[in-house]
Amino acid sequence: MATTTAPSRQLTQKEADIQMMLAADVHLGTKNCNFQMERYIFKRRNDGIYIINLGKTWDKLNLAARIIVAIENSQDIIVQSARPYGQRAVLKFAQYTGAHAIAGRHTPGTFTNQLQTSFSEPRLLILTDPRTDHQPIKEAALGNIPTIAFCDTDSPMNYVDIGIPANNKGKHSIGCLFWLLARMVLQMRGTIRPGLKWDVMVDLFFYREPEEAKQPEEDEVAAPDYAIADFNVSAIPSDGQWPAAIDQPWNDAVPQPIPAVPAVNWAAPEAVAGDWGEAVPPPQQIPTAGIESVPATGWE
């Protein structure tokens, strides 16, 4: 009996994104679980690691993208990451979506102290880790700023309005999440047509070691040229015969000898220009003819 193979079905956008998240270890949680994150847990492995339901992760990413698109001015959105693995992803996300990025340590009072030069009042705050970025979350709560954060299984959910369940500790996971969120935002804005592949690779959102960034720069530096200089070897005939000018006499080319230094009699007495014992003549007085004496003013 002949067996017929079913044609390969093309994956939907959601299925392709979930496969990418699986490859980036977005589904791996921690050994601890917050009670508010239990609804996003798929199962628990034998080693104690909680597995996150990526279907709910994709739905939360879609919801967060809709909220970002609803804000007219992109500069009113602040995306922030104090974790080193998320700083490059934050900068790339801000580059493609037009948001304002804060990569590094948060300055206390940025959202509450109006006397600071870096004071700002955003309409939306996007964070990488609620535990690491606890200071901006508290300030956003005081200023009634909605907050979107990537939450791991052990992340606190206090003052987080939209928590996206995902692994927020891996460099590949964070880069993949920000890449998916940026692509969804651009698709909803109409910059990217739905169903078409985004020409920006996800690797650009990944964290890079400082040594890896310096290596291409060192390779681009041109090595010094230590090759032997060209001394016009082509001028020498290939038949081995030297030109006739070499056979000419060389007498005229010999330089004249340097004349000898005249002999000096060092025993002769040294001639003295004058007698040092003579008296020095007295100084001569300069005539003051024509110069009138200045009358006394009485100030002395």
From Swiss-Prot:
Which PANTHER family does this one have?
40S RIBOSOMAL PROTEIN SA (PTHR11489)
Which NCBIfam families does the annotation name?
uS2_euk_arch
Family the UniProt entry places it in = Belongs to the universal ribosomal protein uS2 family.
Give the matching Pfam families: Ribosomal_S2
Where in the cell? Cytoplasm
Query: What are the record keywords, sorted?
Result: Cytoplasm, Ribonucleoprotein, Ribosomal protein
Q: Which GO terms describe its cellular component?
A: cytosolic small ribosomal subunit
Q: Domain of life, per the record?
A: Eukaryota
- BP term (GO), one: translation
Residue ranges of the region described as Disordered:
275-300
Q: What does this protein do?
A: Required for the assembly and/or stability of the 40S ribosomal subunit. Required for the processing of the 20S rRNA-precursor to mature 18S rRNA in a late step of the maturation of 40S ribosomal subunits.
Quaternary structure (record): Component of the small ribosomal subunit. Mature ribosomes consist of a small (40S) and a large (60S) subunit. The 40S subunit contains about 33 different proteins and 1 molecule of RNA (18S). The 60S subunit contains about 49 different proteins and 3 molecules of RNA (25S, 5.8S and 5S). Interacts with ribosomal protein S21.
Q: Which gene encodes it?
A: RAP40
Q: What is this protein called?
A: Small ribosomal subunit protein uS2
What terms describe the molecular function in GO for this protein? structural constituent of ribosome
